[in-house]
From Swiss-Prot:
Molecular-function GO term, any one: ATP binding
Keyword Metal-binding on entry: yes
Function per UniProt: Catalyzes the formation of S-adenosylmethionine (AdoMet) from methionine and ATP. The overall synthetic reaction is composed of two sequential steps, AdoMet formation and the subsequent tripolyphosphate hydrolysis which occurs prior to release of AdoMet from the enzyme.
SUPFAM superfamilies: S-adenosylmethionine synthetase (SSF55973)
Gene3D superfamilies: 3.30.300.10
Ribosomal protein listed as a keyword: no
Residues that, per the record, bind ATP: 14, 180-182, 250-251, 259, 265-266, 282, 286
Subunit text: Homotetramer; dimer of dimers.
Taxonomy, superkingdom: Bacteria
Family to which the UniProt record says this protein belongs: Belongs to the AdoMet synthase family.
Cofactor needs: Mg(2+); K(+)
Provenance organism: Deinococcus deserti (strain DSM 17065 / CIP 109153 / LMG 22923 / VCD115)
Protein name from the UniProt record: S-adenosylmethionine synthase
Encoding gene, per UniProt annotation: metK
Amino acid sequence: MRKFYTSESVSEGHPDKLADFISDSILDEFLRQEPTSRVAVETLVTTGMAVVAGEVRAITAHVDVQKTVRDAVMKVGYTRANYGFDAEYSAVLVSIHEQSPEIAEGVDHSEEWRGMSEAERALPENAYSLVGAGDQGLMFGYATDETPELMPLPISLAHQLTRRLAELRKNGTLPYLRPDAKAQVTVVRDGDVHDASETLVDTIVISTQHGEDVTQEQIRQDMLKHVIQAVIPAEYLTPDTKYFINPSGRFVIGGPHGDTGLTGRKIIVDTYGGAVPHGGGAFSGKDPTKVDRSAAYYARYIAKNIVAAGLARRALVEVAYAIGRAHPVSLRVDTYGTGTVSDERLAQLVEAHFDARPQAIIAQLDLQRPIYAQTAAYGHFGRPEFPWEQTDRAEALRQAAQG
């Protein structure tokens, strides 16, 4: 039976992604000045205005939030007042206050740590038990061997399309392009086979903001030639592949002037494109003590090492936390029947080879650095520049599974 799988991506100029980029740019500036800063910042962008609100705890950092916002908007490409939103003239309203002392205490000193004697605290196994999770919740990480980066094919292709649109806009190849854009890819497969070699692209949708003077026919021709054919491997395309290019027609009004944007509204774009469950927590604007972000990264790290080790073709890792506690309350591995050992055995291996306490995650992946603005568009996963994409524990896992 044929099955269809669809994922979408949005460009850095999409209003929700712009909001994510602003929030992560502010986070990065705090971490640049003070790596232990606690940050939870949300952004709203709309016609002529950006609003930044949230909670921060920092002792030495003094961030010029207004300047950081305007610099972020400039980088994305909203540089003209006639866009209805721009870096120079749009208002920037800031309402940032101190992190709740009750939350801070639960993170600073975990429930486990508070219950230990001084002698217990000095034990090596408790070195990473000081910091508690910044919230409760469940997080998922996933990897699949259907692409070289171990990501689902539909979201991988969708991100490549939006990246290509941004490239053509910035290098001047298609000067009529504007920052706001979306792409969507539907693939078709036989049954539950997750194999790129047995996959075809059924439908591609591209909606891109554009200037006043270009025709829709010109846009269609350029999207087919310079974007789709340049990105999608020919073996995935057939004479029956459907292309919907700006299917709503004219798309001159875009970005925050066309739609209000908010931090955290593209969580499926940020992760696996709907291929697996999502715990619901957004990433952007949050420092790594927030397990919504850091534990999702770590779960991807675990899943990717499982697949890279050849222990499964697909791996889903679920981890859950209680606020103020260091140790996860649960950890689950699901390989969808593709594992070379049982899922229960894999979970045991994960617990032996990975430490999912928040402080341990931060140390292992070196997360208290200004690396987050670059995550805000085109997905947080499948990109080798990020530390959670390493497969440095694959060999140890493989050997342990054979023992």
